[in-house]
Regions:
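Non-catalytic, polymerase-adjacent accessory regions of viral genome-replication enzymes
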Residues: 1-92
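Conserved nucleotidyltransferase catalytic core and NTase-mimicking acidic/glycine-rich helix/loop elements
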Residues: 19, 23, 378-433
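Core structural elements
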Residues: 58, 63, 111-113, 120, ...
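Amphipathic alpha-helical blocks
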Residues: 86-109
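Conserved polymerase palm-domain catalytic core
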Residues: 101-116, 120, 152-318
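Glycine-rich active-site/cofactor-binding loop and its immediate structural neighborhood
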Residues: 121-130, 134-139
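A conserved non-catalytic segment of reverse transcriptases
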Residues: 223, 299-371
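Extended C-terminal regions of large enzymes
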Residues: 405-469
Length: 469
């Protein structure tokens, strides 16, 4: 097992501050072309840099942008213990040496730290945490390579790409269904990020990234290893789910699937490793499922999860948290029941009686959650759902207030304070009804009207939905 000190020593090169204030470039380079302007240059390709792609990656402007993105994303420290807050000072002292090390090909990435993230189905997803330094280096690579591949990627691919989103993917699905493609081949890849074949990935990468030093650096990241309980294990396949390069590498591998589906003239939508193919009959769907499964497993050397992959009507399936419905010969988008269930679970946690947080803090957390959720699912038709969720959530909030008041005398004082007649307030304060029942009774619906709750800071789901739909 390698220790942290050795990792740092292997990465550090001549001293010489490379950073100034909160920049990774010296002030004299502040006017260098930005990476965003490059991404719109249609002439970008691997040959453009004449074998000096690595120098382009390590340009000061690109390094500055990567540093700022990593800093903004925050996140935990990796195996070396360096935090995002420590990063600026670390790069000031070692940035130039690290840059030279990468150019010479002597830089060695650190192993990643593995963590388990619970999934809704009770299982867990393995994510990895690279060191903050390796996040910056992966980010600078991704910022230059992404524009080179963007012009090659399929129009049917929507995941982890600039100016593309899950919303666009779902709208495209509806378009296919509306035009008669009412059978779905839902392909589920088993542990995709853990099973990517390195050799196939490197070959596809090399066709566009015409610099062997860049290819070598990417391969080093693929095989950098995983640290579990202090022991480093080699990685012979897969790409780290959680690394800054992973989304791009995932799209590079699955672009081969996109090309094959386009060659066959199929209607499909892919978002990262979620792929739905649309056809007009059950027979065609079964045939496509069998042939595409063979292609994925034999050609791409990936594994199809046959238990989760299925052929069915689109309104019976879930895609990116959405589903569909048909009414009056029109296809609509709805939030899938599982997505609603998970949302309510998160709302329940914030409004749990056992939660000791203040009501002000709860209101803030609810606003953040509701805003994010509605912004994502706002393309769905969910007016009735939003109204129903609002009623349920208001009742939960009333329950929280009642629980916080606890004692009879406290309840009495607060009821009177909120305008309830003293005799009624005393009667209400002495009730033996349970919390949930009280929350739906006139005792609290009169004490906390909908308008009262709005003034107290409760974000209305329906109001938020009306702004985005």
């Amino acid at each position: 097992m390698k220790d942290t000190k050795k990792y740092n020593e292997s990465r550090q090169l001549p001293k010489g501050g490379y950073l100034h204030k909160d920049r990774v470039e010296p002030e004299s380079s502040a006017g260098a072309p930005s990476i965003s302007s490059m991404s719109e240059n249609k002439e970008n390709n691997g040959n453009k840099y004449n074998g000096r792609l690595l120098e382009k990656i390590l340009e000061p402007a690109n390094l500055n942008l990567a540093y700022k993105k990593v800093k903004a994303n925050k996140g935990s420290s990796g195996v070396d213990g360096i935090t995002v807050e420590d990063l600026l000072e670390f790069l000031k002292q070692n940035g130039q040496r690290i840059r030279q090390s990468i150019l010479k090909g002597t830089y060695r990435p650190s192993p990643v730290q593995r963590v388990e993230i619970p999934k809704p189905d009770g299982k867990s997803r393995m994510l990895v945490i690279p060191t903050v330094l390796d996040r910056v280096i992966q980010q600078v690579i991704a910022q230059i390579l992404s524009p080179l591949f963007e012009e090659k990627f399929s129009e049917h691919s929507y995941g982890f790409r600039p100016k593309r989103s899950a919303k666009q993917a779902v709208l495209k699905c509806r378009e296919y269904i509306q035009t008669g493609y009412t059978w779905t081949v839902d392909i589920d890849l088993a542990k995709y990020f853990d099973t990517v074949n390195h050799d196939r990935l490197i070959r596809r990468l090399s066709k566009t990234a015409k610099d062997s030093r860049v290819i070598s650096l990417v391969r080093k990241y693929l095989v950098s290893g995983v640290m579990i309980n202090g022991v480093v294990t080699e990685t012979q396949k897969g790409t780290s789910q959680g690394g800054n390069l992973s989304p791009l590498l995932a799209n590079i591998v699955l672009d081969e699937l996109d090309t094959e589906l386009e060659r066959r003239g199929l209607c499909f939508v892919r978002y990262a490793d979620d792929c739905n193919i649309y056809v007009k009959s059950r027979k065609a769907a079964d045939r496509v499922m069998a042939s595409i499964t063979r292609f994925i497993e034999d050609k791409l050397r990936l594994k199809v999860n046959k238990q989760k992959s299925t052929v069915d009507r689109p309104w019976k399936l879930k895609f990116l948290g959405f589903s569909f419905y048909h009414k009056n010969q029109k296809i609509g988008i709805r939030v899938h029941p599982e997505s609603i269930k998970r949302f309510k679970q998160r709302l329940k946690w914030i409004t749990a009686r056992s939660n000791a947080a203040s009501m002000t803090h709860r209101m803030l957390k609810l606003k953040q959650l509701i805003t994010g959720w509605v912004n994502y699912y706002g393309i769905a038709d969910m007016k009735k759902l939003a109204q129903s969720l609002d009623e349920w959530l208001r009742r939960r909030i009333r329950m929280c207030y009642w629980k916080q008041w606890k004692k009879i005398r406290t309840r009495y004082k607060n009821l009177v304070k909120r305008g309830i007649d003293k005799s009624k307030a005393w009667e209400f304060a002495n009730t033996r009804k349970g919390y949930w029942r009280i929350a739906g009774s006139p005792i609290l619906t009169r004490t906390f009207t909908n308008e009262d709750l709005r003034k107290l800071g409760l974000q209305s789901i329906m109001m938020r939905y009306s702004l985005v739909h």
